[in-house]
Every structure is written in C-alpha cells, then in structure tokens.
A protein has these predicted regions:
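Short charge-dense sequence patches
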Residues: 76-82, 110-117
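Anionic N-terminal interaction surfaces
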Residues: 3-103
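Acidic, Ser/Thr- and proline-rich intrinsically disordered linker/docking segments
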Residues: 2-15, 20-25, 62, 68-69, ...
C-alpha cells in the first residue's frame, strides 16, 4: 500500500500529480546498506557539523496540507411590487484542505534527518524521532508533535538506514 492511498484514500491530487522520482543514491551504497553497513557519502549541499557523517542522500518530495477557504453563497429574490424587490441570502466560508507536493533532497546523517527544499524543508536530530511508518513509495516521520510525509524512490533503503542508526 502506498503512502498516498493510506493518507488520501485513492491517492493522487487534483492539482498536483504524484511525482515520479529517479534515485540518485549510488548502487554501491544501496548494496552496503542492505548488507547492514552504513556507507559514508559526500554531501555537496548539506553543511555537516563536526563529527557528522552523511549515510543517505536521495531525491524526495514532501506532502504538506494546505488549507484555504471557499465561499458558498445562496439566496433568493422576490418581486413584491413593480420596482420593489426583496433580496435574502447568506454566505458561508468552508475550509478546504489540499495536498501540496514539494520536491527536494533528503539526507540522513548519523545525527540528523534533513529535507532541503525551496519550501517546507526541515532538519531534526535523530534522537527526537518518535515514529517511522514506511510505505511502498514513501515514509512518514514523526518528531514529537510534527509529522512529515515524504515520497521517496526507495523508501525501504531509507527505513533501513534509520533502523541501523536507532
């Protein structure tokens, strides 16, 4: 079962199609992870702290909920006499939540889990990770009260790295 079908029922968005992501993680690193060892990868964009090593890097997309309001109007008009019309009606605002997909780069180091993107990026220490749910095409990471839903080309390998680090 995919992450989108679990979260949104049938999966998919009306405005934002599910991105098809091509992995950038080297095959040698994937083989090393599946054998139970953590590879050390070079990260050109991520600034590593002292003593920090990058063990996983891949393209990803984060799913965030975007809430906006739509107006609903209804009413009627009644002609009382010639030139006299009575109008009645009301307007209500209805909240509508849609999913927004943002592409970026997902890193797992020995100290942090980082998603770098133009919007909705995050960086959390691994010790604050409280739950990980893996799906066929993504991961759901919970850090105390904040949950991040990510689409990944190889979610199983990312989950394996997190399991090796925790």
């Amino acid at each position: 079962m995919g992450i989108l079908s679990k979260i949104f029922g049938t999966g998919g968005f009306e405005n934002d199609p599910i991105p098809q992501l091509q992995s950038i993680l080297p095959a040698v690193a994937i083989a090393k992870i599946h054998s139970g060892k953590l590879p050390v990868l070079q990260s050109d964009k991520l600034i590593l702290k002292k003593g920090e090593l990058c063990h996983f890097v891949d393209v990803a997309a984060i799913i965030t909920d975007r809430k906006h309001y739509q107006s609903r109007r209804r009413g009627s008009s009644v002609s009382v006499a010639r030139g006299w019309v009575i109008h009645t009606g009301s307007t209500t605002s209805v909240p509508v939540t849609t999913g927004e997909v943002t592409k970026g780069i997902f890193y797992i180091t020995n100290k942090r889990i980082v998603f770098v993107a133009s919007r909705h990026g995050f960086s959390h220490v691994i010790s604050s990770l409280t739950a990980v749910t893996d799906y066929d095409n993504g991961l759901e990471l919970q850090f105390s009260s904040r949950t991040h839903r990510l689409i990944l080309p190889d979610a199983f390998t990312a989950k394996k790295v997190i399991d090796l680090l925790t």
